[in-house]
């Protein structure tokens, strides 16, 4: 959904990243040519990395602003070490979870609220807002149909390779630290 609450255009895939950037309000759904992906399979689509694992931004495609990047698996594993029950945010009323990373969860520890945003399926349908969410990582999980992501719902939290590249998930950027390595 766009900020003005109108629905995005849904267009059959595949499409190149360069073409997709020309039309930011389009959602590219799967096609008969590409059942699991809206573009070619490319682990370095959003963030690049050297052979020894140093992460650096692919500024052409990265959805995060300068100084920020998509999370690596370690970022999600660290974040999801401790978390709250599935709750409504006191200010917004949106369902989700509080995450406190390495600190045992409690109301007086540093924490961050991640909302259950739902997702847009490969056919372009909106699904499960306030019930479930997947947050993208920068890590491809091998094969055409797998991307690592932080997943949670009312009774589960997991970092899992169960996401499909063609589905629209939430993006939560993390601070980009120069020279940081993938783990």
Regions found by a protein language model. Name each.
Residues 1-42:
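Low-complexity, Gly/Ser/Thr/Pro- and Asn/Asp-enriched, turn/coil-prone segments
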Residues 25, 30-183:
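C-terminal, surface-exposed recognition/capping segments
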């Amino acid at each position: 959904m766009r900020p003005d609450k109108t629905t995005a255009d849904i267009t059959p895939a595949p499409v190149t990243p360069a073409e997709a950037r020309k039309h930011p309000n389009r959602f590219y759904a799967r096609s008969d040519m590409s059942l699991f992906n809206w573009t070619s399979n490319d682990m370095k689509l959003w963030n690049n990395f050297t052979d020894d694992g140093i992460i650096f931004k692919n500024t052409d495609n990265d959805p995060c602003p300068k100084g920020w990047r998509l999370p690596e698996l370690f970022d999600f594993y660290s974040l999801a070490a401790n978390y709250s029950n599935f709750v409504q945010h006191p200010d917004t009323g949106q369902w989700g979870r509080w995450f406190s990373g390495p600190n045992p969860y409690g109301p007086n520890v540093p924490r961050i609220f991640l909302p259950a945003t739902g997702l847009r399926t490969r056919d372009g349908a909106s699904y499960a807002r306030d019930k479930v969410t997947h947050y993208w990582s920068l890590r491809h999980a091998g094969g055409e149909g797998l991307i690592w992501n932080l997943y949670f719902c009312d009774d589960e939290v997991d970092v899992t390779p169960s996401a499909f590249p063609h589905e629209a998930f939430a993006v939560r950027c993390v601070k980009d630290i120069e020279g940081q390595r993938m783990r």
